[in-house]
Regions:
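Secreted/periplasmic proteins
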Residues: 1-196
Length: 198
């Protein structure tokens, strides 16, 4: 890792920092919501996050971090992972998952922060720009410079492949249910005999 220097002269032609090979995907964004607070999911998380139930992997484990977003600027499209929260708030679920404008009023009402790689790929110059963004499923994302780097990137780390987390969580749930049934049966030997006899 290292400092993701935003100065364009400090970036390579494939949109990464010149001084190091990034261990995290340099194509990332921040959105003004965090689904986890104090080690637990926020009360509204399961209700407002469309993929919550499918991606749930355990108490306090974010279902938002690493989610893919498509960003469009001047008819150019880029893909990035949601890796941070902001700008300026982490509570704005009506904007992130709904149709409300950002509650933030600073920086011309910014509703998304983009990484230097996203900025440069889209050709954004200056401090602010109006972009359009939306969530996208991993299987819909074409290969591009966003698919080259990062231990957190399923293009690079196949162990993070789409659906793997939800499959693992389903398998874990089934295993826990089976273990609970086994514990109950072991508490009552007569019931266990009945179950074994069919």
């Amino acid at each position: 890792g290292g400092f993701d220097n935003p100065d364009p002269v400090c970036r390579t032609r494939d949109f990464r920092p010149k001084t190091f090979i990034p261990r995290q995907n340099p194509f990332y964004v921040a959105l003004p919501y965090n689904d986890v607070s104090r080690g637990e999911h926020k009360a509204e998380a399961s209700r407002v996050i469309p993929w919550f139930r499918r991606e749930y992997a355990g108490k306090g484990q974010s279902v938002c971090k690493g989610r893919w977003v498509q960003i469009v600027y001047n008819k150019r499209s880029c893909f990035a992972q949601w890796e941070d929260c902001g700008p300026f708030t982490t509570e704005d679920w009506p904007y992130v998952f709904g149709d409300k404008p950002p509650v933030n009023t600073q920086n011309k009402g910014a509703g998304i922060d983009i990484s230097p790689a996203v900025r440069d790929y889209l050709g954004i110059t200056g401090g602010t720009a109006i972009v359009h963004w939306r969530f996208v499923e991993f299987y819909r994302i074409p290969r591009g410079p966003w698919s080259k780097y990062g231990d957190n990137n399923p293009f690079v780390n196949a162990g993070l492949g789409a659906g793997k987390k939800s499959l693992q969580s389903r398998e874990d749930r089934l295993r826990r249910q089976q273990e609970a049934i086994q514990r109950e049966l072991l508490k009552d030997p007569a019931k266990l005999r009945r179950e074994l006899q069919g």
